[in-house]
Amino acid sequence: MAKSVKGTRTEKNLLTSFAGESQARMRYTYFASVAKKEGYEQIAAIFTETADQEKEHAKRMFKWLEGGMVEITASYPAGVIGTTLENLQEAAAGEHEEWSLDYPGFADVADEEGFPEIALMYRNIAIAEKGHEERYRAFIKNIETASVFAKEGEVVWQCRNCGFIYTRSEERRVGKECRSRWSPYH
C-alpha cells in the first residue's frame, strides 16, 4: 500500500495548488471572453487552451488527495477582470510565481516527506507553467508594440476557422472564404 498523504504538508500543498489551478482555469475562461470581445481571437484561444491545461493540472493534484476536510491558509487573486493586456500581465505574474516559487517548494516538501511521484508531478507542471508565462509575455509584447495584427517582414497567417493560409506582413481582417479571423501560423 502506498504511503498516505493524510496529515502531511504535502496534503496541504496539494489542496492549495488544486484550488489555485482551479481558480486559474476560471480566470482564464473569463479572460478569454474579454480578449474575444476586444478582437484578440488568438489570445482568446490561448486563454481557453491554457484554462483546459490548468484543469488537467488540478485533476492531477486532486487525484493524490484522500478525502476528508483539510484546512489550508492561502492567498489567491481576488476578482478583477481587466483589459486583455492587464489580464495577460496578471496571468504571467501568476504563472511565474507557480513555476519559480510555489511548485519547486512543494516538490521539495514532497521529496522530504517521501512522496517522489508527487514531487515529480510538481516539477513537470512547473515546466508547463513556465511555458504559459513565456507565451503570455510574448502576447504582452505584441500588444505593447502594436504587432498583434502586423509583423515585420513576411509572415504565414492562417484562418482560425477554415485553415486557409497566406503570406504577408499584415493580417487579413477576415478570412478569404469563411470571413473568420487570422493568426500567425506556426
Features from the language model and the residues they span:
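Non-heme di-metal
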Residues: 1-173
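Positively charged, low-complexity/disordered segments
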Residues: 176-186
